[in-house]
């Protein structure tokens, strides 16, 4: 959703800075409300709140679709709508992350459950970008936002139908929102496993994986080829290949047994994903405009990009699933919403980090920006090596 909003802005302005700004506005809005969302998840009925947030997302996306369809879109309007979507998502994500554990009766299946939950999300990463890239090429961006709006509406209806047994472990004494938020933060700060996993997750998404938000700029070189403008198709292919890699990683993770040291797997996959994204950015520097013009579909640039983004998707998916599994297994029930809400800021870092990435890309290039950002993350990894938490025990 943020990628296609970014593409709309990039098509209007041609600015990598504004492309990164749109994504970061969404991410910052999400981060601001994540803390509130975590407290709400621990205080109130999650299912009802999820229905409300799903309907709010559907209405907001419908407005964006109508604005785009009637050619009223401006950078300011898109940024405003993305900020609203970010605020809604900030409440929505902690609810989603904390509610699904209520559906698991046998906690020994939590690794497979987290992998399956992630698999559904990653599955949409395959269908949505692949179809979206080609749909945009032939029908434009409005149809994408209409479809997204319909998806959230269907989700709200499904939630109304689903029955589930909510956790009965609610805080008996309600404190202020600030005190309850600080309680979650203090817990993370004092627990080494939670502290290290969450910091690693933030750094990885903020410094390494935010390159995804610049895909519209990275594929800009395919606008002028002998086949015409195929940038949207290439964008769809790259995002879909990354999604296929992520699904593959989730399938691999679902086979992992609880007795295996999840801590070592988490850290190892984190390092590998950063290295692969570095080489993905490097592959986009190996460009020959003349060769891309004549043979875009078999160019060395596209071939290497596909390979690196596929394996980056695998390693990053394993990292995400293993890290979430460790947290879900260890978090106290009365703090689950707040702690997991703070962890979901991880996914906001993916978009928030795009602002700095976009600024670098504006003055240099998207490829150089991706390479330098992952190089910085590689240095941060040295600080992570002191932890090899078991997690799976």
Residue ranges and their predicted role:
Residues 11, 127-147, 221, 353-370:
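Transmembrane alpha-helix termini and helix-breaking/packing motifs in multi-pass membrane transporters
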Residues 167-198:
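Juxtamembrane intracellular "pre-TM" segments in multi-pass secondary transporters
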